[in-house]
């Protein structure tokens, strides 16, 4: 069984795959100061409740866009599971070309989404990830990663609106039935929701125009189903896309070997 860890700016997702299916997924808020022992106690309790023996986990892979969290996640794998984790990075064997000026600067989550989306849906395609940032990643028909777009995330935009305008409250995100709001909060909700639907539709159209052909569109991230309700341009939503990318990456790359000194506490 493989321990798969997807560390984002907002949440860290832990999952276990037994070679045929996901046995469980668990989510915790990202905190760069949380120690490996805190992760270990929390995770082993959840594994036990799911009937998963920690000793049966024989591999680990980590994808993170939070460098400060990597140290403790690596120590978790070493100290609690006696494993040296594979760390997702551009230099690994992805099975596709990365056609970027500086591949090393690309967030691992974007490459992982591209890997899983092309494997599951074929190309050419656009992967949209509704996270802290809203990213659009483009994969051609041969599976090569050819670039993308980064826009502010929905929650980030909501918070910025509240912080910058003293009289605008902090609001929840939902789909308004009407575009024209009759008071402040409905007007804000409409601007956020339908504004992001418009951003999605507009960027898909512009990406396809640049690419020169229609493309499949796959969305992931917590808000993907909600945004997909408002547009026909999102063809599939896949909540486990990044986890699946990590699983596939681990299949393509040999597991690192845990050296004795790495198993000791630093």
Curated annotation (Swiss-Prot):
<keyword id="KW-0173">Coenzyme A biosynthesis</keyword>
<comment type="similarity">
    <text>Belongs to the type III pantothenate kinase family.</text>
</comment>
<comment type="function">
    <text>Catalyzes the phosphorylation of pantothenate (Pan), the first step in CoA biosynthesis.</text>
</comment>
<keyword id="KW-0963">Cytoplasm</keyword>
<protein>
    <recommendedName>
        <fullName>Type III pantothenate kinase</fullName>
        <ecNumber>2.7.1.33</ecNumber>
    </recommendedName>
</protein>
<feature type="active site" description="Proton acceptor">
    <location>
        <position position="109"/>
    </location>
</feature>
<feature type="binding site">
    <location>
        <begin position="6"/>
        <end position="13"/>
    </location>
    <ligand>
        <name>ATP</name>
    </ligand>
</feature>
<keyword id="KW-0630">Potassium</keyword>
<comment type="subunit">
    <text>Homodimer.</text>
</comment>
<feature type="binding site">
    <location>
        <position position="132"/>
    </location>
    <ligand>
        <name>ATP</name>
    </ligand>
</feature>
<feature type="binding site">
    <location>
        <position position="129"/>
    </location>
    <ligand>
        <name>K(+)</name>
    </ligand>
</feature>
<dbReference type="GO" id="GO:0046872">
    <property type="term" value="F:metal ion binding"/>
</dbReference>
<dbReference type="GO" id="GO:0005737">
    <property type="term" value="C:cytoplasm"/>
</dbReference>
<feature type="binding site">
    <location>
        <position position="184"/>
    </location>
    <ligand>
        <name>substrate</name>
    </ligand>
</feature>
<keyword id="KW-0418">Kinase</keyword>
<dbReference type="GO" id="GO:0015937">
    <property type="term" value="P:coenzyme A biosynthetic process"/>
</dbReference>
<dbReference type="InterPro" id="IPR004619">
    <property type="entry name" value="Type_III_PanK"/>
</dbReference>
<dbReference type="InterPro" id="IPR043129">
    <property type="entry name" value="ATPase_NBD"/>
</dbReference>
<comment type="pathway">
    <text>Cofactor biosynthesis; coenzyme A biosynthesis; CoA from (R)-pantothenate: step 1/5.</text>
</comment>
<keyword id="KW-0067">ATP-binding</keyword>
<dbReference type="Pfam" id="PF03309">
    <property type="entry name" value="Pan_kinase"/>
</dbReference>
<keyword id="KW-0808">Transferase</keyword>
<keyword id="KW-0547">Nucleotide-binding</keyword>
<feature type="binding site">
    <location>
        <begin position="107"/>
        <end position="110"/>
    </location>
    <ligand>
        <name>substrate</name>
    </ligand>
</feature>
<dbReference type="GO" id="GO:0004594">
    <property type="term" value="F:pantothenate kinase activity"/>
</dbReference>
<keyword id="KW-0479">Metal-binding</keyword>
<dbReference type="GO" id="GO:0005524">
    <property type="term" value="F:ATP binding"/>
</dbReference>
